[in-house]
Amino acid sequence: MRGEPIISMKTGVQVLLSCLKRNQSAKETVFVSIITFGDHASEAVPLTSVQDLAVPDFEPHGCTMLGEALELLARSIEEDVVMPSAAEKGDWKPIVFIVTDGEPCDDVRHGLDDLKRGCVDTIVACAAGQDTSLDPLRSLTENVIRLDTAGSHTFESYLRWNDISDD
């Protein structure tokens, strides 16, 4: 990822985080983890409160190991997300934003299956760069956006909070 796509990715992440930080419910309930995937997938930012989040400077490297990243994400969700039960309220289902500028270099099917079997609410695939092909992203999810044209309203359409009161 170089040039316009990396700028698009950085801008898109900042717009998304800005949307979250402006919303009081999000500030109180949202946690974010960032997984990068170049030559290898790694957790660049462990699960952190959105209000405490410091986004690292992303540096492009290697090919797009998206399948490996999806497998890592599925494992992280399994370990970190508390499922609702009779004894515990549990966490909100995660909303996953996948940001990429190209086709994966590895097989995404296993990781995608693991992710969809888990407790994910929504997967949004974000194309970083106007030349990014949308076809590989559409194979991941029906929710596909282009970061170069996305604004805060685009992200907000996927971020919903319900004020629930106990009467």
Where are the predicted features?
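Short, well-ordered amphipathic alpha-helices
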Residues: V13-K21, L73-V82, L112
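Von Willebrand factor
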Residues: M1-V45, Q51-W92, I95-V99, T122-P136, N143-D167
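Cysteine endopeptidase catalytic domains of the caspase/legumain-like
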Residues: K21, A44, V81-E88, C119-V120, ...
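Alpha-helical scaffold elements adjacent to nucleotide-binding pockets in ATP/GTP-utilizing enzyme cores
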Residues: S8-G12, L16, A69, G111, ...
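Short, flexible, mixed-charge acidic loops at enzyme active sites
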Residues: A44-D52, L140
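VWA/integrin I-like adhesion module and closely mimicked acidic/polar interface patches used
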Residues: I7, G102-L140
